[in-house]
């Protein structure tokens, strides 16, 4: 079983925000497999599906971003998933809109959901798919208001394609592993 965690904030007011792009990817996968989300065995919702014989557990934490590690640990422990079989999907303020980066391990890069997962797990050695949300002309002021803001019309067109490509990258990870997915999907989606 592969554990696929999309990060975001749980309230409807955060739907469509930059910070919730991880949710958009797992939602896209769940929709394509007609797999409804239901309450999980911890602070998360889950959807189960299968792709070419590989079981996938899609997870949406019901905690806020800064406490995502609670959901990750609960799902890992309940389903006895090893960290090499887990992929976390999140936004990345350090990457421009349209960029996808898969990594087998690494720092949190200032992403608080990743930071909490690393703290809870005691390691940064787990796969992640980062989706760029940075604008070329970053507005002055708080980064939190930026990440909690919605994409503008042009960005939304790009992000819709990025979500689709990211869903394909998740399926590649599930079948072929992180190294293969990195060679195929680390790119900018125009």
Curated annotation (Swiss-Prot):
- Where, subcellularly, is it found? Cytoplasm
Its Enzyme Commission number?
3.1.1.29
Q: What is a single cellular component term in the Gene Ontology annotation? A: cytoplasm
Q: Where is this site: Discriminates between blocked and unblocked aminoacyl-tRNA?
A: 9
Entry keywords, A to Z: Cytoplasm, Hydrolase, RNA-binding, tRNA-binding
Q: Which domain of life is it from?
A: Bacteria
| GO-annotated biological processes | protein quality control for misfolded or incompletely synthesized proteins; rescue of stalled ribosome
Q: Where is the signal peptide?
A: none
Q: Which InterPro entries match?
A: Pept_tRNA_hydro (IPR001328), Pept_tRNA_hydro_CS (IPR018171), Pept_tRNA_hydro_sf (IPR036416)
HAMAP family per UniProt:
Pept_tRNA_hydro_bact (MF_00083)
Record family assignment: Belongs to the PTH family.
List the protein's name: Peptidyl-tRNA hydrolase
């Amino acid at each position: 079983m592969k554990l696929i965690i999309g990060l975001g904030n749980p309230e409807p007011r955060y739907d469509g925000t930059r910070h919730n792009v991880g949710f958009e990817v797992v939602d896209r996968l769940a929709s394509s497999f007609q797999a409804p989300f239901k309450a999980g065995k911890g602070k998360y919702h889950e959807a189960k599906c299968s792709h070419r014989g590989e079981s996938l557990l899609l997870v949406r934490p019901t905690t806020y971003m800064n406490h995502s590690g609670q959901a990750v640990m609960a799902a890992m422990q309940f389903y006895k998933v090893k960290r090499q079989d887990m992929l976390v999907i999140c936004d990345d303020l350090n990457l421009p809109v349209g960029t996808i980066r898969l990594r087998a391990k690494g720092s949190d890069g200032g992403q608080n959901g990743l930071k909490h997962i690393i703290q809870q797990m005691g390691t940064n050695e787990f796969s992640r798919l980062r989706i760029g949300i940075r604008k070329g002309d970053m507005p002055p002021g708080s980064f939190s208001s930026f990440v909690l803001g919605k994409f503008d019309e042009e960005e939304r067109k790009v992000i819709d394609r990025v979500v689709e490509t990211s869903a394909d990258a998740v399926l590649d990870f599930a079948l072929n592993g992180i190294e293969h997915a990195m060679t195929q999907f680390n790119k900018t989606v125009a």
